[in-house]
Design a protein with these regions (language model features):
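Helical segment within the ABC ATPase nucleotide-binding domain
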Residues: 182-197
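The feature captures the beta-strand-to-loop junction immediately N-terminal to the Walker
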Residues: 51-53
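Conserved ABC ATPase signature
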Residues: 143-147, 151
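Short coil-to-helix segment of the ABC ATPase nucleotide-binding domain corresponding to the Q-loop/switch region
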Residues: 103-110
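Helix-to-loop junction immediately C-terminal to a conserved catalytic motif
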Residues: 66
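Conserved signature/switch motifs of ABC ATPase nucleotide-binding domains
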Residues: 142, 163
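Conserved ABC ATPase "signature" region
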Residues: 110, 121-139, 189-191
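Catalytic Walker B motif of ABC-type/P-loop ATPase nucleotide-binding domains
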Residues: 168-172
Length: 274
């Protein structure tokens, strides 16, 4: 384990979650913990990737983690010692970064912050801090249609930080992006997550490289084979990788590390079998 790196208590616990839709088993006894990560002398959060091929049930798991849907059985606990997840406990960033088009940037943030239950003055201070950090103070009176794609992303993420300062859940944030845009989104996710040691960003995606390049932990979802090699319906956790413990958590130049490429190849080889 790298010097100065240690693992703390579970901050998200997924316990035996199962879900059926239309008679089809989508998730089956799915369990994993997301553990707090501590780095000596560093103030930084963590990024966790939930990886799986298309159609494996990632969207349904996303909604359960966000408290938007309930599983048929099992539970999701948030924080330490752990409380059942409820809508609003986790900030949710949808795939296409939806905003209130008829409201200004400032109003978008303040409407989102109203769900936090914090006093007006605290919400205004938080919104100003976010706009300053995202270099958008001069856009606070603009409408979403006047923003670039990258600026919209920042405001959509800012909305969710206004709601939940600790947990951020992102659905396929890299989908359909070219290399330049993908790099910008990765940089933004790193910036938001590492701004505070309590922050945890969970990325649900099928993009192996984009997730592993910035993740501290990766959970691989898939369907377990039976004794004849036939897939049993319902996604489970097939593997979990602690990239921090492996010395492969995000750092400058990680993509040039041969061990990092071996990890990518291992995951890529498993994907078709999931």
């Amino acid at each position: 384990m790298p010097n100065g790196y240690s693992i703390g208590d579970p901050i998200i616990q997924v316990k035996n979650v199962s879900l059926k839709l239309g008679g089809n088993q989508i998730l089956r006894d799915l369990s994993f913990d997301i553990l707090d990560i501590l780095r000596e002398g560093a103030t930084t959060g963590q990024i966790v990737g939930l990886l799986g091929p298309s159609g494996i049930g990632k969207t349904q798991l996303f909604r359960i983690l966000a408290g938007l849907n309930k599983p048929d059985s099992g539970e999701v606990l948030i924080g330490h010692p752990g409380a059942p997840v409820q809508r609003g406990m986790v900030g949710v960033v949808a795939q296409h970064y939806p905003l209130f088009e008829h409201r200004t940037v400032w109003s978008n943030l303040m409407v989102a912050g109203a769900h936090s239950g914090k006093p007006q003055a605290d919400r205004e201070r938080r919104a100003n801090d976010l706009l300053d950090r995202f270099k958008l103070l001069d856009r606070k009176d603009h409408y979403p249609a006047q923003l670039s794609g990258g600026q919209r992303q920042r405001i959509a993420i800012g909305q969710q930080i206004m709601c939940s300062e600790q947990f951020l859940l992102m659905d396929e944030p890299f989908s359909g992006l070219d290399c330049v845009a993908l790099d910008a989104v990765q940089e933004l996710i790193n910036e938001v997550t590492h701004a505070h040691e309590l922050n945890t960003t969970i990325i649900v995606s099928h993009d192996i490289s984009a997730v592993c390049e910035i993740a501290d932990q990766v959970v691989l979802l898939g369907r377990e084979p039976d004794e004849n090699g036939k897939q049993i319906p319902g996604a489970k956790v097939m593997a979990k990788y602690d990239l921090g413990e492996m010395g492969l958590a995000w750092r400058k130049g990680i993509t040039a590390d041969p061990d990092f490429h071996r990890l990518l190849e291992e995951i890529r080889q498993r994907f078709p079998l999931l």
